[in-house]
């Protein structure tokens, strides 16, 4: 392998910033300001892999910042049922991402909305809420809504039956990540 500049990977749970650690966004701002004035720079994992495509592969042990260093909070009798649905939804997303290109703008929007629905269903907040027993009904409903919308978008896309008004309605209801790109779920994205 050729010489590589040293790299520090510093991942954080996004929930930490502004939710549990209110000063977190300010901390990040100062990190990036200090970076701009220093002799080191930031890089995304994708940019790193483009620069250094040959890498040693490692298996990382499963761990968590949660109780006991494992996933006790997120995989528990109160919430473990969701994972079979999340896995099936992810499989559907990968299938359409690896499939044919959208024929038109509506299909493209629908696939991007599928990606949004999957990300919103996969947020660990829902399982955390179920475990802690706060707003449990709300958490069940949110996961169910996002999964059902994703499956409906999938079926409508596969059958050529997309309803523009329904797609527009769910886009306006949940339009987080307006620049999302469904192709990121392709197995050949990198």
What are the residue ranges of the model-derived segments?
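Active-site and substrate-binding clefts of carbohydrate-active enzymes
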Residues: 1-190
């Amino acid at each position: 392998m050729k010489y590589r500049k040293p790299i520090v990977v510093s991942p954080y749970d996004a929930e930490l910033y502004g939710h549990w650690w209110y000063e977190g966004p300010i901390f990040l701002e100062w990190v990036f300001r200090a970076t701009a004035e220093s002799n080191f720079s930031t890089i995304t994992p994708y940019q790193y892999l483009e620069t250094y495509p040959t890498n040693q592969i490692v298996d990382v042990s499963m761990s968590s910042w949660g109780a006991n260093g494992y996933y006790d909070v997120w995989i528990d009798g109160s919430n473990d049922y969701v994972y079979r649905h999340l896995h099936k939804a992810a499989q559907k997303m990968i299938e359409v991402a690896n499939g044919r290109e959208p024929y038109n703008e509506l299909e493209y929007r629908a696939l991007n909305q599928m990606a949004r629905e999957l990300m919103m269903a996969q947020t660990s907040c829902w399982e955390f809420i179920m475990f802690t027993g706060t707003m449990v009904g709300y958490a069940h409903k949110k996961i169910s809504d996002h999964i059902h919308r994703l499956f409906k978008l999938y079926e409508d896309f596969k059958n050529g039956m997309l309803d523009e008004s329904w797609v527009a309605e769910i886009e306006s209801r949940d339009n987080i990540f307006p620049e999302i790109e469904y192709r990121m779920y392709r197995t050949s994205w990198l």
